[in-house]
Amino acid sequence: MAFGKSLFHAIGRVSLVRQIAAGLALGIVIGSVSPQLGLAAGLFGSLFVGALKAVAPVLVFILVAATIAQHQKGNKAHIRPIIVLYLIGTFSAALTAVIAGMVFPTHIVLAGAGDVSAAPPSGIVEVLKSLLMNLVANPINAIANANYIGILAWALVLGAALRNHGSDVTRQVVADLAEAVSTVVKWIIRFAPLGIFGLVSSTIAETGFGALAGYAKLLAVLLGCMAFIALVVNPAIVWWKIRRNPYPLVFTCLRESGVYAFFTRSSAANIPVNMALAKKLGLHEDTYSISIPLGATVNMGGAAITITVLAMAAAYTQGIQVDFATALLLSLVATVSACGASGVAGGSLLLIPLACSLFGISNDVAMQVVAVGFIIGVIQDSAETALNSSTDVLFTAAADLGRQRNRAE
């Protein structure tokens, strides 16, 4: 018993990042050496992601409602500058992907469209309609289905009603509930090393690395664009806001948010992680409690890259030459589509046919491109989610720190 306690204390003294690194390394070894054991270990990953996904909608609803209910008149949440950064970042990602697609034209071997079961949206109007319908969804269904647009809308309405008509005791109860749910999130995050060990070992056991070799160039363009956004474009945007070296903040967000998101492959599951990081960075709670769940829905730079690169690859594969004007239009369509990706089953991949329609590519061919996306999804989706989710907290921090700098001046 004493040995067990001392072991837990020793593990507790090791930083969470190092524990995650150890879990990652062990997962790679187990998944490679013993696929059967790796698949069995996948249960830990499923439990970890399931717990995060389960608590995230409740956390967002209660935290946003509590924040609005306790919001004092005269205090501003300063959400608008963050939304502007989200849109700039997403459009920059789409434009970067267009340029990369023209500089490194990629031809792909089309996979069978039968591998894709879901139906893509018929047009941009359907994407926007889906977003608006999510806004007025039943609040219980919104929480149950992790519909964050609906959750945000109802939390804002309930919080405003409590602020104007609730008693001090009622508002305090909601605040205590928010604190309790935040504590539960901290407990879940402590199991991240075990969860990531399970996710990595099962992924490698299931797919290995051979399935990705045939699409190496396509993956290189996708990952290159995402790395360029994460390490060049985003830091430039952050510098514009805070006017000092952005890289310490950028690397903190990538390390403490991007790593989790890469392995969970879920922006929703990463919301509690981003909330905890925002609190650690000392950001304004009235701001990040709204901007981070909103970012998980509309800040989709990684999705814009995926849509653009695969649509251009489809065009080149069909022998279609892409002129700059069409490419620029593709950037705009990809930006709007990416912002609606969370409202579409299948996310960014099923918005590819919408982008392909700009080039007159048939739906049959477009769905084969989507099937290719699912083949490389083990890497593409992980990198996309890491970029999307880490950028949520990065831009929130940049806007908040920029506001503090302006106030100091």
Curated annotation (Swiss-Prot):
Pfam families assigned to the protein according to its UniProt record, in alphabetical order: SDF
GO molecular function: neutral L-amino acid:sodium symporter activity
Topology relative to the membrane: Multi-pass membrane protein
InterPro entries in the record: Na-dicarboxylate_symporter, Na:dicarbo_symporter_sf, Ser_Thr_transp_SstT
Transmembrane segments: 24-44, 48-68, 82-102, 142-162, 194-214, 218-238, 292-312, 319-339, 365-385
Subcellular localization: Cell inner membrane
Any GO BP annotation: threonine transport
Record carries keyword Transcription: no
Keyword Phosphoprotein applies: no
Domain of life (superkingdom): Bacteria
Catalytic activities: L-serine(in) + Na(+)(in) = L-serine(out) + Na(+)(out); L-threonine(in) + Na(+)(in) = L-threonine(out) + Na(+)(out)
Gene Ontology CC terms, in alphabetical order: plasma membrane
Keyword terms, alphabetized: Amino-acid transport, Cell inner membrane, Cell membrane, Membrane, Symport, Transmembrane, Transmembrane helix, Transport
Entry similarity comment: Belongs to the dicarboxylate/amino acid:cation symporter (DAACS) (TC 2.A.23) family.
The protein's role, per its UniProt record: Involved in the import of serine and threonine into the cell, with the concomitant import of sodium (symport system).
Official protein name in the record: Serine/threonine transporter SstT
Species of the source: Neisseria meningitidis serogroup C / serotype 2a (strain ATCC 700532 / DSM 15464 / FAM18)
